[in-house]
């Protein structure tokens, strides 16, 4: 557990303050001339990003999320690491790995022009993870993984970003995913690239394969386009639980599937990253809206 007083050196007057909104969970509240934001040390988890020129937040956060120690937060940008979804060989281990439920250390906070930048870190053998997030007119997130051992390892990761939308019926995804083949995780069937926008009429769980450096989430209901620019990523996961699955999720409201979709930047399955001793791999994304 991190005590609030231990975070005092990282405060930035009128820009970054710390609170304990839930027992045992500390968060940082960010205010800049261009946005507001929030992050939790548990999970190295960004939970809010709201540009001030937008009526609605960019990130979705479930009203039913369980804010408790060692519990994942439903929404924002969870970090899936070092495996994605179920563990490949041990079903007793938690889905999406350990990074999203462990306590991270705040390493630094600073002002860059009008932006607030924070860095969080966690070490669990053999990996050291560093997350740098910059809040401003855009949200920039970079996750670096370093192998601190003397052996070769591999890992999966995903920045499991939940986007808030007006209504799932009003949105489509366009851009580089048009040219990417995908695995439908619901049917285990692989599909060739379809060269058309992605829309939602049912539960959707797809892993798109290949570099997708420019993705657009177009929301006709809010007349808004969210741009996602990714680097160091060979996988993009598109997900919405729809009606039946959300009923099995205790931390997800009955109608919340209508107000969100996930577009996840990462490296999973066949794109798992081999990493030699001492090497560092960085996956990053930039989110901005227009």
For the regions a language model picked out, list residue spans one by one:
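Beta-strand-rich N-terminal accessory domains
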Residues: 1-71, 213-214, 218-234, 277-290
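Membrane engagement elements in two modes
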Residues: 2-14, 22-29, 72-83, 87, ...
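Extended, loop-rich substrate-binding clefts of extracytoplasmic carbohydrate-active enzymes
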Residues: 20-22, 91-136
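Hot-dog-fold acyl-thioester-processing enzymes
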Residues: 58-99, 227-250
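Beta-strand-rich interaction surfaces with strong enrichment in secreted/lumenal proteins
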Residues: 68-69, 130-132, 270-275
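Acidic/His-leaning functional-site neighborhoods
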Residues: 102, 199-275
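Acidic, contiguous internal or C-terminal segments within carbohydrate-active enzymes
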Residues: 120-155, 159-163
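Active-site/ligand-binding surface loops and adjacent short beta/alpha elements
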Residues: 152-154, 162-236
């Amino acid at each position: 557990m991190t005590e609030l007083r231990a975070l005092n050196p990282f405060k930035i007057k009128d820009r970054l303050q710390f609170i304990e909104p839930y027992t045992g969970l500390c968060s940082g509240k960010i205010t800049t001339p261009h946005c507001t934001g929030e992050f939790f040390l548990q999970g190295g988890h960004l939970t809010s990003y709201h540009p001030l020129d937008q009526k609605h937040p960019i990130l979705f956060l479930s009203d039913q999320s369980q804010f408790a120690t060692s519990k994942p937060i439903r929404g924002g940008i969870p970090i899936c690491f070092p495996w994605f979804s179920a563990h490949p060989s041990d079903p007793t281990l938690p889905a999406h790995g350990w990074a999203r439920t462990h306590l991270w250390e705040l390493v630094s906070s600073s002002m860059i022009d009008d932006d607030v930048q924070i860095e969080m870190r966690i070490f669990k053998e053999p990996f050291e993870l560093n997350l740098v997030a910059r809040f401003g007119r855009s949200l920039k997130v970079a996750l670096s993984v370093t192998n601190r051992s003397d052996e070769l390892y591999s890992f999966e990761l995903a920045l499991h970003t939940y986007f808030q939308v007006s209504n799932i019926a009003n949105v489509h995804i366009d851009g580089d995913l048009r040219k990417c083949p995908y695995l439908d995780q619901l049917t285990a069937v692989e599909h060739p690239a379809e060269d058309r926008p992605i829309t939602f009429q049912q539960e959707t769980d797809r892993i798109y394969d290949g570099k997708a450096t420019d993705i657009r989430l177009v929301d006709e209901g809010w007349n808004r386009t969210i741009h996602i620019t990714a680097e160091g990523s060979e996988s993009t996961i598109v997900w919405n639980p729809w009606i039946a699955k959300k009923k099995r999720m205790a931390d997800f409201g009955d109608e919340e599937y209508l107000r969100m979709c996930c577009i996840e930047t990462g490296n999973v399955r066949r794109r798992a990253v081999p990493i030699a001793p001492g090497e560092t791999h960085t996956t990053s994304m930039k989110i901005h809206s227009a």
